[in-house]
Swiss-Prot record:
Disruption phenotype: Dwarf, wide leaf and small grain phenotypes. It comes from Oryza sativa subsp. japonica. The gene is AHP1. This is Histidine-containing phosphotransfer protein 1. The keyword Phosphoprotein applies. GO terms for molecular function: histidine phosphotransfer kinase activity; protein histidine kinase binding.
Amino acid sequence: MAAAALTSQLNALVNNMFAMGLLDDQFQQLQMLQDSTAPDFVSEVVTLFCDDGERIICELSRQLEKPNVDFDRVDSYVHQLKGSSASVGAQKVKNTCIQFREFCQQRSRDGCLKTLDLVRTEFYDLRNKFQAMLQLEQQIQACYPKH
């Protein structure tokens, strides 16, 4: 497929992610930091976010399965996820983390479990779209041979 068609697909995907509220302006700020000196900057940051997010969500599940939940520890993990979400512009995940932290402060296991399900769904939805975005970027780069 031609680079122009792939670029069009990529732009449509990213625009859709903004329209769905998955991303906010912070993602555009990230994109502006990418240039010829750091051509893989966005993909590196997004990959790190996806890896960290998956690790944190697994840890949150483990913590909330314990008979005596350490809500301060859970809150610390949610705070990490909120921070990394904010840094990549993952608006829905970040906003759900804000709700999650409120349940941690209330010491509500049920609230935390329900919000964990929501944050998991939103995170994996975003991760899948990020993976599609990165694949399109790789296909576009493959259209231009390196000298």
